[in-house]
């Protein structure tokens, strides 16, 4: 099954703001949440899995990639304004795409994200709009 997740993401600190996406002291928490919602969800739900194994006592620990029939073909898209985001700190992944939108009004970015999903829905079996701090724990969520 091919699944497309799309999420809006804005981090633009402003003094005395009540919103976490506008609070500098929340930067680390927001960065960790974005990492879990992107790379974490990709690692948890794709057909690509990683094993971490020791080569023996006092030997190296290695990481190996495995492909399984479990999971889905998952792509995650982050829809974000340039200069007002934390996406530059995410590791590269072939199934993670960052789209730097030209939308100036940050409150309209969720609408742009939804539009992107609708414009690309024919290429996927399932599409989903997700916030930038949501982790999908259930391994059967997409089944």
What are these regions (language model features)?
Residues 131-135:
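The conserved acidic donor/metal-binding loop of glycosyltransferases
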Residues 13-15, 85-86, 136-137:
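Eukaryotic short linear interaction motifs
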Residues 21-73:
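Short, acidic, metal-binding catalytic loop of nucleotide-sugar glycosyltransferases
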Residues 2-7, 39-42, 74-78:
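Hydrophobic targeting segments
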Residues 137-143:
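Conserved donor-nucleotide/metal-binding helix-loop-beta segment in metal-dependent transferases, i.e.
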Residues 55, 62, 72, 79-126, ...:
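Active-site-proximal specificity loops/subdomain of glycosyltransferases
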Residues 4-27, 31:
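A conserved hydrophobic helix/loop-capping motif in glycosyltransferases and polysaccharide synthases
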């Amino acid at each position: 099954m091919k699944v497309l997740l799309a999420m809006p993401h804005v981090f633009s600190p402003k003094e005395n703001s009540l919103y976490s996406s506008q609070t500098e002291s929340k930067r680390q928490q927001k960065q960790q949440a974005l990492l879990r919602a992107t790379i974490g969800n990709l690692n948890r739900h794709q057909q690509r899995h990683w094993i971490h194994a020791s080569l023996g006592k006092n030997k190296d620990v290695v990481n190996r990639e495995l492909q399984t029939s479990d999971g889905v073909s998952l792509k995650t898209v982050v829809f974000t304004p340039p200069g007002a985001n934390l996406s530059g700190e995410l590791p590269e992944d072939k199934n993670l795409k960052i789209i730097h939108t030209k939308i100036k009004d940050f409150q309209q970015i969720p609408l742009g994200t939804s539009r992107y999903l609708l414009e690309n829905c024919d290429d996927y079996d399932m599409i989903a709009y997700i916030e930038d701090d949501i982790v999908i724990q259930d391994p059967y969520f997409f089944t």
